[in-house]
Amino acid sequence: MLMPKRTKYRKQQKGRNRGKAYRGSTLAFGTYGLKAVELGRINSRQIEAGRVALSRTMKRTGKIWIRVFPDKPLTAKPVGVRMGKGKGSVEEWVMNIKPGRIIFEITGVNNETAVRALTLAAAKLPFKTKIVSMESENELY
């Protein structure tokens, strides 16, 4: 499970996820990538499911980079507990995703394998994505 080793404060306010991504919106390491098209929130289980789908499809050839890290705590109260009595405990760690953010990058595989792997990884994410390549920074398929 991806989560910070330590934080200054245990809990955060919810905040609002608006706008588009300017940082982390271009390919930096690999030749193919998965780019978010809409707003969303990704947790560590979804990142791990995408990573497993990529590595199984690529059959341990090539290299995978995970460009996101869940650093925002999400709190929840237990079921059957009345409102009040303070904020709930931390349930999971998430990251707010804005349109244009690169989620995964891969290299060292051919075009067909890259598209197949990234399509499977995209199915594990809760928001729409598109596949981009180094040659064309816009949509590949």
From Swiss-Prot:
Gene Ontology CC terms: cytosolic large ribosomal subunit
GO biological process terms held by the UniProt record: translation
Entry keywords, A to Z: Ribonucleoprotein, Ribosomal protein, RNA-binding, rRNA-binding, tRNA-binding
Pfam families: Ribosomal_L16 (PF00252)
Region named Disordered: 1-20
CDD domains: Ribosomal_L16_L10e
Subunit organization: Part of the 50S ribosomal subunit.
Family annotation (HAMAP family): Ribosomal_uL16
Function as written in the Swiss-Prot or TrEMBL entry: Binds 23S rRNA and is also seen to make contacts with the A and possibly P site tRNAs.
UniProt protein name: Large ribosomal subunit protein uL16
